[in-house]
């Protein structure tokens, strides 16, 4: 059996040429918290605790996937946004920290209804619903993305009116006070530099 300290060393040794040290450290502790439930300080306290072979193998799978430049959020199938847990997969984009600023800005406004266009994971409407008593709707053209968004709403205990619709060919939108959309804004040429 391996120890927690061995797992930490394994991440560092295997990924030091793949990413900068700070990113490797972040991946390490996010993965440990995901699989073992340990915070960074728990890792110090439990450095000599045994890790089962199954869990050790899972850490190795994570490292292998990181070496292919697959984002950790997709490997784990989840991310955090606005202090909430969200499922993510290949049908959704990973919420960006800048989008939290957009949510902050919207929450400063008084409103009783809002619509998110191109919802993806549902992170914007779910964060709004967790922090404001309002009727929130969300539209996406992708049924697969809406499936993830519905799961995220359930996980976070909020009700959102999810609508499968192509915003470009439909004018049948809910009447709301606020409309928000945060479509992808990374250029195709920039994608390679992100990973």
Task: Annotate the PLM regions.
Residues 8, 28, 59, 72, ...:
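A general structural signal for well-ordered alpha-helical segments in protein cores
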Residues 34-108:
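Conserved AdoMet
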Residues 22-26, 53, 75, 96, ...:
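Non-catalytic, surface-exposed connector residues within folded enzymatic/regulatory domains
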Residues 1-55, 59:
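A short N-terminal interaction module
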Residues 19, 23, 39-40, 71, ...:
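Secondary-structure boundary/capping signal
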Residues 98-193:
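Conserved SAM/SAH cofactor-binding pocket of Class I
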